[in-house]
Each structure stands twice: as C-alpha cells, then as structure tokens.
Amino acid sequence: MPYTAEAFQNEFLALGATEVNAIVTVTSSGAEGGRRTSGATEIIIVDASGSMQAEGRINAARQAAKAAVECIDDGVNFAIIAGVSTAQQLFPAPGQLAVSSPQSRSDAIRSIDRLQASGGTAMGAWLLLAAQLFGQRPGDIAHAILLTDGDNGERAGYLEQVLDSIAGRFTCDCRGVGVNWKVSELRKIAQAMLGTVDIVAQPSGLTAAFEQMMVKAMGKTAADVQLKVWTPVNATVRFVKQVEPEVMDLTGKRIEDGPRAGRYPLGSWGAESRDYHICVDVPAGAAGDEMLAARVSVVEGDTVHAQSLVRAVWTEDTALSTKINRQVAHYTGQAELAEAIQAGIEARKAGDDRTATIKFGRAAQLAHASGNKATEELLATVVDIEDAATGTVRLRRKVEAADEMALDTRSTKTVRVGRAQ
C-alpha cells in the first residue's frame, strides 16, 4: 500500500528559539486493486432505549441499520448490537460474528425487524460487547457505528473506564439523532476511538448517514497505521495533532518505541490524505547551527512505508526566521477556530453573553480568513455575522438546539490550504 509523507515548515529559527513546527501530509493511494491487506469486521450498535420510540426514531434506525448492512462487502465479518440498559446482540447468535453474504445480510435484515425500543442507555456496556466481538478477529480492520438519542445512564466514570480499556482496538463513528443527547459524551467516545461524531437532526436523515459511514468503512484497506516520531537527544515532542480533515489531538495516545521514539495511532486507512501538526522542543543553537529536529515515519508494525524530516536552522536573518510557514499558520488558526467555537458554546450555556460574543466573533473571523465556508455558515445559525473580517457578531436571541449541536459537533472539521508558500 504506497504512502508518501511530506513536511511543510519554515526551518529557520531566530537565535534563542527552541520551538520547531511542521505540517506533515500523509497520503495513501490505497492497496493495489482496492484489496484489503487484512480481514475486516463491522459492528452496528443501535440505541434501542425507550426514548427511541419518539418521533419515529426506532423505525428510522431500523431502516438505517438495514441500509448499512446492505453496504457490507462479501466476506466481511459483522454483528448488530441492540443497545439498552445492557448490550444485547441482535445478530448473529450471541458471542458470534457472521460472514457477510447475500444470505447472511438477508438474515440480518430480518433480525433488525425485531428491534424494539425499551429500556435505558448504557454506552459503556455496548462498547464493551463490541470490543469482545472484535477480539475474535485480531488484526482485522475493525470499525463500529454507534447511534444514540440520549444521555448515558451508567454510573459516573464507567464509560471513561471502558474507553481506557478498549482504546485502540477499533474505530468508532458516533451519531446522535435528535437533540436530547450530549455532544461532549459522543465526542469523548469518538476521540478515544479515533472516530467521528455528528448530529442527525431528523430521523429521516439516518439512512443516508449510515450508508455514508459504511461505504467509507468499506474503502479502508489497512488496519493499523501509525506515525512514528523520532527525536534526537535533548529534543522532545510537545504535541502531535491531526489537523485535516478534522482536529484530533494524538499527543496523549503516544506509545513509546525505543529510547527516543514514540508511535501515534492513525487508525485504518484507504486511499486518502491527512495532515498532522508536529511540534518539537529543541535546545537553542548558535547562528548557522543546523539539526534534525524529528524524523517522522508512516509505519505498520515493523514496515516503514514513508518518511519525512523536520529540520531546524538558526539564523540572525530576521527576514528568514520571522516568516511563518503558510501550512503551519493555517492549521494553527483552524485549531484555534475549533477551540473558540467550543468556548463560545460553553459561555452561551453559562449565560456569559459577553464571552460568547467575543469567542464567536473570533471564530467568525478565523473561518472567514481561512475560507472555511461550511463553519462560517454553521456560525451564522447561532450568531448574526455583521462583519466576518473584523469578527463583529451579535448573539441570536433564539437558537435552535439542533443548529447549536451541529456547530459544536462540526467545529473540529477543517479545510485544507494550498501548498504554495
């Protein structure tokens, strides 16, 4: 599976400077012929709690789950979990995985017709059962879809314990239907499991959302790709963040690999490209000094697919050292944009209109300057943007809950910058 890794940076540092920043673009053309390099397992987790009866949500969830099953390729292992106060395996028999075929997909669809809404919400238990099922197929491309419409009902801290114990075993894309679920809860799951989170405001949108997630999952051809970052003596990694297609901090997911290297999980890959912001602290150098600040490799197990170097060169020439690389500047702004939106939402909920206005104003300014039109349009559902260039906004008196939740869930989505300096 061919990969490339390309670093974008201004390697010139002012005298006394110790912080090195680079954007590393990792691109994969996918496996030859689109064939997977390992097996694949898919698990669909559908909230079947009592609240799913409202607004036709359970019926829409049934149709969405059926549509997702129809998208599963022949030969892929799969299972369906009904989520209530416990995790109940709907298909196949408890503790087993089915192998996708026209017959097994037809059987699964009949099982989905039995899905009824009653009981509570226990996301930790649902995820734990999924992890146990995935455990039967080590090395597979492992992906889950989790749908809910409400708050987790488990004791405080239990979901976090489960996430700590299963992180890295599979990726999980989370969707909330309606407006009675917590964005922070699903974001916690998605971040721990290297997945995505989004709102499906109306039940009628579930089928398209499920089909989109499953089709994307079927395009993955490699199971466990990692970014290995080596730094020299006296240099340390400050952070590693995915910054495109959305912001995700990978710093805390580091696994040590030898005395001066660490691996950061990137999840499963197909034919795609993603950008990562690497920040390294190095000892200050004298004018003319040059050093390798980091060696960044794309790896699978012991196989190194691609490599890129991050350099540092100290100079007295301020024209060189003060020039901020376009990619670094752009993605630093996109990360600030996500933080500003989330801070604005929190301030608005707390009744702090002044802080909310300031944060949303800064977000509007950043979205406009970076060409992130999708985020600018989402902001316009929460504030009236009077002048995006200066960040002048007014809070709207009435904001639909679905609009605010859409802004929150999609705040981390970024746009790519052109490659010219």
PLM regions and their residue ranges:
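Hydrophobic residues positioned within well-ordered beta-strands of beta-sheet architectures
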Residues: 3, 20-22, 42, 225-227, ...
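Exposed acidic/Ser/Thr-rich ligand/metal-binding surfaces
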Residues: 4-224, 283-285, 369
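Beta-strand elements of well-folded, non-transmembrane domains
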Residues: 9, 26-30, 48, 231-233, ...
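Short acidic, flexible loop segments centered on an aromatic residue
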Residues: 82, 227-235, 245
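Local beta-strand/beta-hairpin segments that build beta-sheet-rich folds
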Residues: 90, 96-98, 275, 289-295, ...
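Extracellular adhesion/glycan-binding regions together with long Ser/Thr-
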Residues: 247-271
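Low-complexity, intrinsically disordered segments enriched in Ser/Thr together with acidic residues
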Residues: 268-288
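Long, acidic serine/threonine- and proline-rich intrinsically disordered regions
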Residues: 282-421
